[in-house]
Protein backbone atom coordinates (compact mmCIF):
# COMPACT_ATOMS: atom_id res chain seq x y z
CA UNK A 1 0.00 0.00 0.00
CA UNK A 2 1.25 3.51 -0.83
CA UNK A 3 1.85 6.03 1.92
CA UNK A 4 -1.02 8.26 3.05
CA UNK A 5 0.83 11.26 1.59
CA UNK A 6 0.46 9.86 -1.94
CA UNK A 7 4.06 8.73 -2.29
CA UNK A 8 4.40 5.30 -3.91
CA UNK A 9 6.61 4.07 -1.05
CA UNK A 10 4.84 2.25 1.78
CA UNK A 11 4.06 4.24 4.93
CA UNK A 12 6.69 2.23 6.85
CA UNK A 13 9.40 3.59 4.53
CA UNK A 14 8.00 7.06 3.92
CA UNK A 15 6.22 8.99 6.69
CA UNK A 16 6.32 6.52 9.59
CA UNK A 17 10.05 7.03 10.33
CA UNK A 18 9.42 10.78 10.51
CA UNK A 19 6.36 10.25 12.73
CA UNK A 20 8.57 8.24 15.08
CA UNK A 21 11.32 10.89 15.00
CA UNK A 22 9.79 14.23 13.93
CA UNK A 23 13.15 15.89 13.48
CA UNK A 24 14.52 13.30 11.06
CA UNK A 25 13.08 14.95 7.92
CA UNK A 26 15.96 15.79 5.60
CA UNK A 27 14.07 18.26 3.38
CA UNK A 28 10.89 20.35 3.72
CA UNK A 29 8.91 18.09 1.36
CA UNK A 30 9.46 15.11 3.68
CA UNK A 31 8.10 17.09 6.62
CA UNK A 32 5.15 18.36 4.54
CA UNK A 33 4.25 14.81 3.51
CA UNK A 34 4.58 13.57 7.11
CA UNK A 35 2.37 16.42 8.36
CA UNK A 36 -0.31 15.49 5.81
CA UNK A 37 -0.10 11.81 6.80
CA UNK A 38 -0.42 12.90 10.43
CA UNK A 39 -3.71 14.59 9.49
CA UNK A 40 -4.96 11.34 7.94
CA UNK A 41 -3.89 9.42 11.07
CA UNK A 42 -5.33 12.07 13.44
CA UNK A 43 -1.88 12.58 15.01
CA UNK A 44 -2.39 16.03 16.57
CA UNK A 45 0.80 15.84 18.66
CA UNK A 46 3.00 15.36 15.59
CA UNK A 47 1.45 18.35 13.85
CA UNK A 48 1.96 20.53 16.94
CA UNK A 49 5.53 19.33 17.47
CA UNK A 50 6.54 20.14 13.89
CA UNK A 51 5.43 23.77 14.03
CA UNK A 52 8.31 26.20 14.52
CA UNK A 53 8.66 26.98 18.27
CA UNK A 54 7.91 30.68 17.61
CA UNK A 55 4.40 29.69 16.47
CA UNK A 56 3.53 28.43 19.97
CA UNK A 57 1.28 25.83 18.35
CA UNK A 58 0.39 24.20 21.66
CA UNK A 59 -1.66 27.34 22.41
CA UNK A 60 -3.73 26.54 19.29
CA UNK A 61 -4.30 22.88 20.13
CA UNK A 62 -8.10 23.03 19.68
CA UNK A 63 -7.93 24.65 16.22
CA UNK A 64 -5.16 22.27 15.12
CA UNK A 65 -7.15 19.29 16.41
CA UNK A 66 -10.21 20.44 14.47
CA UNK A 67 -8.14 20.65 11.28
CA UNK A 68 -6.52 17.26 11.89
CA UNK A 69 -9.90 15.65 12.48
CA UNK A 70 -11.26 16.84 9.12
CA UNK A 71 -11.74 14.18 6.43
CA UNK A 72 -8.55 14.64 4.38
CA UNK A 73 -8.47 12.83 1.03
CA UNK A 74 -5.19 13.36 -0.77
CA UNK A 75 -2.10 15.51 -1.15
CA UNK A 76 -0.68 16.89 -4.38
CA UNK A 77 2.80 18.46 -4.27
CA UNK A 78 3.02 21.16 -6.94
CA UNK A 79 6.58 22.34 -6.38
CA UNK A 80 9.39 22.56 -3.86
CA UNK A 81 12.21 25.07 -3.66
CA UNK A 82 14.90 26.17 -1.29
CA UNK A 83 14.82 29.69 0.10
CA UNK A 84 17.39 32.46 0.24
CA UNK A 85 19.43 30.41 2.72
CA UNK A 86 19.95 26.64 3.13
CA UNK A 87 17.82 26.87 6.29
CA UNK A 88 14.64 27.93 4.48
CA UNK A 89 12.48 25.94 2.09
CA UNK A 90 9.07 26.10 0.45
CA UNK A 91 6.51 23.48 -0.56
CA UNK A 92 3.59 24.47 -2.78
CA UNK A 93 0.80 21.92 -2.42
CA UNK A 94 -2.88 21.17 -2.72
CA UNK A 95 -4.63 19.12 -0.05
CA UNK A 96 -8.13 17.86 -0.70
CA UNK A 97 -10.75 17.27 1.98
CA UNK A 98 -14.37 16.19 2.14
CA UNK A 99 -16.80 18.29 4.13
CA UNK A 100 -20.38 17.02 4.18
CA UNK A 101 -20.03 15.34 0.79
CA UNK A 102 -18.37 18.30 -0.95
CA UNK A 103 -14.70 18.17 -1.92
CA UNK A 104 -12.63 21.25 -1.11
CA UNK A 105 -9.06 22.09 -2.00
CA UNK A 106 -6.61 23.84 0.33
CA UNK A 107 -3.76 25.31 -1.70
CA UNK A 108 -0.78 26.77 0.12
CA UNK A 109 2.86 27.66 -0.37
CA UNK A 110 4.26 26.54 2.99
CA UNK A 111 7.48 27.93 4.42
CA UNK A 112 9.80 25.76 6.49
CA UNK A 113 12.79 26.77 8.60
CA UNK A 114 15.67 24.58 9.69
CA UNK A 115 17.05 25.15 13.19
CA UNK A 116 19.50 22.92 15.06
CA UNK A 117 19.41 20.56 12.07
CA UNK A 118 15.59 20.16 12.34
CA UNK A 119 12.96 21.34 9.85
CA UNK A 120 9.83 23.10 11.16
CA UNK A 121 6.70 24.47 9.49
CA UNK A 122 6.48 28.21 10.19
CA UNK A 123 3.81 29.72 7.92
CA UNK A 124 2.29 29.71 4.48
CA UNK A 125 0.79 31.86 1.78
CA UNK A 126 -2.52 31.15 0.09
CA UNK A 127 -2.74 31.95 -3.64
CA UNK A 128 -5.66 34.06 -4.79
CA UNK A 129 -8.78 31.95 -5.07
CA UNK A 130 -9.49 30.73 -8.57
CA UNK A 131 -13.13 30.42 -9.58
CA UNK A 132 -13.77 26.96 -10.97
CA UNK A 133 -15.72 26.97 -14.24
CA UNK A 134 -18.64 24.58 -14.57
CA UNK A 135 -17.01 22.85 -17.57
CA UNK A 136 -13.52 22.67 -15.99
CA UNK A 137 -12.22 19.33 -14.71
CA UNK A 138 -13.30 18.88 -11.10
CA UNK A 139 -10.67 19.79 -8.50
CA UNK A 140 -11.35 16.55 -6.60
CA UNK A 141 -9.46 14.61 -9.27
CA UNK A 142 -12.39 12.44 -10.39
CA UNK A 143 -11.84 13.28 -14.06
CA UNK A 144 -15.44 14.50 -14.39
CA UNK A 145 -16.52 18.03 -15.23
CA UNK A 146 -17.05 20.22 -12.16
CA UNK A 147 -20.79 20.66 -12.90
CA UNK A 148 -21.31 16.86 -12.99
CA UNK A 149 -19.26 16.18 -9.87
CA UNK A 150 -18.79 18.57 -6.94
CA UNK A 151 -20.45 21.64 -8.55
UniProtKB/Swiss-Prot annotation:
It comes from the Bacteria. Pfam families: SEC-C, YchJ_M-like. Gene3D superfamilies: 3.10.450.50. SUPFAM superfamilies: NTF2-like, Sec-C motif. HAMAP family: UPF0225. Belongs to the UPF0225 family. This is UPF0225 protein VC_1852. It comes from Vibrio cholerae serotype O1 (strain ATCC 39315 / El Tor Inaba N16961).
Amino acid sequence: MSCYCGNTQPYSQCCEPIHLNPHSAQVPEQLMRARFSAHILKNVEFVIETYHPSCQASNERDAISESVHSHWLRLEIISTQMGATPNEGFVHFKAFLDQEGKVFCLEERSRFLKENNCWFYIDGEFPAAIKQGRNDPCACGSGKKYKKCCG
